[in-house]
């Protein structure tokens, strides 16, 4: 529906615009004072002069929703898959460190996020094959270590 960016973050017409702007700033999508006000921004598919967002920007909107609602638990499935490495790093830090009282389950093939987590479960063919912290799994030099090394070397 034709809604402002703030309303798309809150998923409601009864939006706390200041809180939505704070959540969008936290997600890295918006800067107060330098961007069009969030209550004026409308997605292009709904308005001729609206904005057309990239997949990465859409992922930041999803993170802004998580920041806006600050639920007790969040599931993030490939949440940063469309972001460049710098945006991904900032996104992951916000996701995992921005709300310390929030539990987060991260599902990802990109292992840069796993180093920030408390516990990692490696799954192969529907089964958990390894479990531990980032450092513990690297020290074991098992499947997680193999995947980490492959990504660290740039899939060379």
Where are these regions (language model features)?
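Conserved H-loop
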Residues: 101-108
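Helical segment within the ABC ATPase nucleotide-binding domain
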Residues: 88-100, 112
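ABC-fold ATPase nucleotide-binding domain signature/coupling loops
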Residues: 30-61, 70-72, 154-155
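ABC ATPase nucleotide-binding domain helical subdomain, centered on the C-loop/LSGGQ "ABC signature"
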Residues: 6-48, 92-93, 101
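Catalytic Walker B motif of ABC-type/P-loop ATPase nucleotide-binding domains
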Residues: 74-78
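Hydrophobic anchor residue at the start of the ABC signature
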Residues: 63, 91, 107
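C-terminal portion of ABC ATPase nucleotide-binding domains
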Residues: 35-37, 93, 110, 115-156
């Amino acid at each position: 529906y034709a809604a402002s960016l703030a309303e798309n973050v809150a998923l409601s017409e009864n939006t706390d615009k200041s809180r939505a702007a704070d959540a969008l700033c936290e997600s890295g999508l918006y800067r107060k004072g330098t961007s069009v006000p969030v209550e004026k921004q409308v997605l292009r598919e709904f308005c001729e002069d609206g904005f057309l967002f990239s997949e990465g920007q859409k992922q930041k909107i999803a993170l802004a929703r998580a920041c806006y609602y600050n639920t007790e638990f969040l599931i993030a499935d490939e949440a940063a898959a469309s972001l460049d490495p710098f945006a991904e790093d900032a996104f992951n830090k916000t996701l995992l460190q921005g709300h310390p009282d929030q539990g987060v389950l991260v599902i990802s093939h990109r292992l840069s996020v796993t180093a920030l987590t408390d516990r990692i479960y490696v799954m192969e063919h529907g089964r958990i094959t390894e479990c531990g912290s980032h450092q513990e799994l690297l020290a074991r030099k098992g499947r997680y270590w193999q995947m980490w090394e492959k990504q660290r070397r740039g899939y060379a």
